[in-house]
Amino acid sequence: MAKAKAKAKKAKPNPRNKKLYDDGMKMRKAVLGAGYVDNSMAGAANDDFMMSFQDVTTEYCWGYVWSRPGLPKKTRSMLNLAMLAALNRGPELKLHVNGALNNGLTKEEIKEIFLQVAIYCGIPASLDAFKTASAVFKERGV
């Protein structure tokens, strides 16, 4: 006897702190773009496992850290580019190169960040970062 397939339950955000979550969602969309964020949330909508990650990312990364008053978004983007390049996190780096451009960084500033990465983190990490940024610049016509 075949078991009836249970209807998939929609996963919904379940933040611990609604204000941090709302602030985080606003900041996340401002930096990464609403389309990217909406796609990420939609991708987690049928997966409680992934929705938990989206909650934590939105609430703490974007609501608590990125929304703090101590550093402007442009500076936070500079830090992220250097850290992601050093860690060789290609997909996230691509996302944050786009975010950095959204936050007002210039191609020249991004180049200087990755040159600094070359000295302190190594040529291979910097080369990958340059390739990633170059692809983003071409996509965006920068």
Short names for language-model regions:
Residues 73, 77, 123-124:
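Short, conserved micro-motifs enriched in small and acidic residues
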Residues 69, 87-90, 104, 121-124, ...:
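Residues at alpha-helix boundaries and short interhelical turns
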Residues 57-61, 78-85, 113-118:
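Short alpha-helical scaffolding segments that buttress acidic/His motifs in well-ordered protein cores
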Residues 108-113, 128-131:
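A glycine-rich phosphate/pyrophosphate-binding beta-strand-loop-alpha-helix module
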Residues 119-120, 137:
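Short Asp/Glu-rich motifs
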Residues 116, 123-127:
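Substrate/cofactor-recognition hotspot
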Residues 78-81, 85-111:
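Mid-chain, well-packed structural core segment of small domains
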Residues 2-74, 102, 128-142:
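Acidic, glycine/proline-rich low-complexity segments that act as flexible tails and inter-domain linkers
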